[in-house]
């Protein structure tokens, strides 16, 4: 290959190194940790990682010599796998802790676990936990940098980041778009983080769902609230469906899953009320025939669901690389 030959992998790496910046805070616990310029910079960096991840050679040495520890106290496929891939592609030593085979299963508290792990000197800790505030608590007990991978019903900031990346790549922008977030908003940390980040990036957000699955005074989030799909989806550019989180429900929030799909499940008829060219999203895992019809979910002309999975790795690489720049005191 000549010196002037086109080399996409090298170009992606050069772009990444030019765009890496020190993360604005010590930890990434909330979508609210980012202002608009910082969020845009992180999305630009993630874009460069998308280009790299599509090459044969995908690895960098940004985290070489660093240890990334994944602490997933709740089951996860997409998030844990993407953080593991992100860490390895950046050159980190990745350790996955399984709570079922750890001292947590013997009754050890989260604080004691944090103190124990801190003694091992990990540089980065990615934590998912069923309790809201768990990531924040952990961040107060460790010297490493903590990334919140989902804490109870509170937040899931890297999901919001990958969703914003998916939207921006599909439309070329986020600002000025109308995003309808539909379904089980009450139990959704994804919804909370998305509302915050989408507002920061200039989108208009609606929440759509039955009254039983809508947080009290949700309007205080700066959103329009709708209890029927007809008005909620009217003119929306993006329709983001949420999983019905039956495992978090203690009581009869919906009459039945069949009844739920009839009124709130996304099918072609309901989608037709959205704006021409509207895109469909779902954070996964999907309950087909409950939140969304397979005909819609699997249609590449409207669905961004597989794009979201791909963007997850790139977005998390961007977060980890920025935290690494903070560790090194480098970046712009």
Swiss-Prot record:
Coiled coil (residue ranges): none
Catalytic activity: carbamoyl phosphate + L-aspartate = N-carbamoyl-L-aspartate + phosphate + H(+)
GO function term, MF aspect, one: amino acid binding
GO biological process: 'de novo' pyrimidine nucleobase biosynthetic process; 'de novo' UMP biosynthetic process; amino acid metabolic process
Entry's EC annotation: 2.1.3.2
Residues binding L-aspartate: 106, 189, 243
Keywords of the record: Pyrimidine biosynthesis, Transferase
Pathway(s) of this molecule: Pyrimidine metabolism; UMP biosynthesis via de novo pathway; (S)-dihydroorotate from bicarbonate: step 2/3
PANTHER family according to UniProt: ASPARTATE CARBAMOYLTRANSFERASE, ORNITHINE CARBAMOYLTRANSFERASE, MITOCHONDRIAL
Subunit: Heterododecamer (2C3:3R2) of six catalytic PyrB chains organized as two trimers (C3), and six regulatory PyrI chains organized as three dimers (R2).
Protein name: Aspartate carbamoyltransferase catalytic subunit
Species classification: Bacteria, Pseudomonadati, Pseudomonadota, Alphaproteobacteria, Caulobacterales
């Amino acid at each position: 290959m000549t010196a002037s030959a086109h080399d996409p992998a090298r170009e992606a790496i050069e772009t990444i190194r030019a765009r890496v910046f020190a993360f604005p805070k010590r930890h990434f616990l909330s979508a609210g940790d980012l202002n608009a310029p910082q969020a845009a910079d992180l999305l630009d960096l993630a874009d460069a990682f998308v280009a790299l991840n599509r090459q044969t050679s995908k690895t960098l040495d940004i985290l070489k010599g660093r240890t990334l520890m994944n602490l997933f106290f709740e089951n996860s496929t997409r998030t844990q796998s993407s953080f593991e891939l992100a860490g390895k592609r950046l050159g980190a030593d990745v350790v996955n802790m399984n709570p079922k085979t750890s001292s947590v299963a013997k009754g050890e508290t989260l604080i004691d676990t944090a103190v124990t792990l801190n003694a091992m000197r990990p540089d980065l800790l990615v934590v998912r936990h069923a309790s809201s505030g768990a990531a924040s608590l952990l961040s107060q007990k460790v010297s490493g940098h903590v990334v919140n991978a989902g804490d109870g019903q509170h937040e899931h900031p890297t999901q919001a980041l990958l969703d914003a990346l998916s939207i921006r790549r599909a439309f070329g922008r986020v600002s000025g778009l109308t995003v309808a977030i539909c379904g089980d908003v009450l139990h959704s940390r994804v919804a909370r983080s998305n509302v915050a980040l989408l507002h920061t990036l200039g989108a208009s957000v609606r929440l759509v769902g039955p009254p039983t699955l809508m947080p009290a005074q949700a309007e205080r989030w700066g959103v329009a609230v709708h209890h029927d799909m007809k008005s909620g989806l009217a003119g929306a550019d993006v329709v983001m469906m949420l999983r019905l989180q039956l495992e978090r429900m203690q009581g009869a929030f919906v009459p039945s899953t069949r009844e739920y799909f009839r009124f709130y499940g996304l099918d072609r008829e309901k989608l037709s009320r959205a704006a021409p060219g509207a895109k469909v999203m779902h954070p996964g895992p999907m309950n087909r025939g409950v939140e969304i019809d397979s005909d819609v979910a699997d249609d590449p002309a409207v669905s961004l669901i597989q794009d979201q999975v791909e963007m997850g790795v790139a977005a998390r690489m961007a977060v980890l690389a920025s935290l690494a720049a903070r560790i090194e005191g480098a970046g712009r």
